[in-house]
Amino acid sequence: MANPLFRKHIVSINDISRNELELIVKTAAKLKKQPQPELLKNKVIASCFFEASTRTRLSFETAIQRLGGTVIGFDNASNTSLAKKGETLADSISVISSYVDAFVMRHPQEGAARLASEFSNVPVINGGDGSNQHPTQTLLDLFSIYETQGCLDNLNIALVGDLKYGRTVHSLAQALAKFSGCKFYFIAPDALAMPEYICDELDEHNVSYACYNSIEEVVPEIDVLYMTRVQKERFDETEYQHMKAGFILSASSLKHAKDNLKVLHPLPRVDEIAVDVDKTPYAYYFQQAENGVYAREALLALVLNATIEG
């Protein structure tokens, strides 16, 4: 069967079909179980981070090297021709893409990855463009859910914290809307509620969702608890303390959880997950971060049409 992801730009999670999502997730599972260190032998991948990153950049570069590829690029745009000499982003993309087989980029400007895809000679993978999209985070989230739940259909998923500005929860909701029977529980302050356009998309897909005031009231029903931080910089101190108070997870909050419940978080956390949760069987956020390597290995291998064993 032809590989539908070969040479495909990965700019938005909406660019990826359900079948393609399943292919990536199952390929990630294969690569986690059976390392294949020569999949990207003789391939050169650009890792161009115009904005600071820790987990995304390091996991991409780890994925490339574990598959036998070579990384070129930068983690700070301040010394590039773009910054020093006024070169346009389009020209930078055109030149860099002529050196490589695939192009991973993060940029603070919304829409930068889409622009890059119009000028690149090779597949562009969006490592985050402002508050817009972060599709590879969603891929590792889906892989972590699949790994712990055994499926991506008929799941009850709670999304907690900053649902207004958090690009990870937007993309995850959009991705899971492609699957059957999922139900969402939105838990957020009114000022940080899920945007209307996401709710409209869920309505279009006949996806069930409802809003709640606390984590404890939904814990007995859910399979996945996806935590995010309330961003302190968006509020004054008094308002922030009030906002975050009702959206902190502790071990005692999980006393009525189902056995299969897993707690996820895109990281970094601040204090929205108490450290006593780390030792519970429900905590999965550090394994989730590790899964970023396997999800990105799978994506790179597929867009470059590598022959995957197993």
From Swiss-Prot:
Q: Which residues bind carbamoyl phosphate?
A: 55-56, 106, 134, 137, 267-268
User: Does the keyword Iron-sulfur belong to this entry?
Assistant: no
Which amino acids does the record list as binding L-aspartate?
85, 167, 229
Q: Name one GO cellular component term.
A: cytosol
Q: Does the keyword Transferase apply?
A: yes
Q: Which PROSITE patterns does the record associate with it?
A: CARBAMOYLTRANSFERASE
Gene Ontology molecular function terms on file: amino acid binding; aspartate carbamoyltransferase activity
One of its Pfam families is OTCace
Subunit structure, as described in the record: Heterododecamer (2C3:3R2) of six catalytic PyrB chains organized as two trimers (C3), and six regulatory PyrI chains organized as three dimers (R2).
Question: Hey, which family's this protein in?
Answer: Belongs to the aspartate/ornithine carbamoyltransferase superfamily. ATCase family.
Protein name per its UniProtKB record: Aspartate carbamoyltransferase catalytic subunit
Origin species: Vibrio sp. (strain 2693)
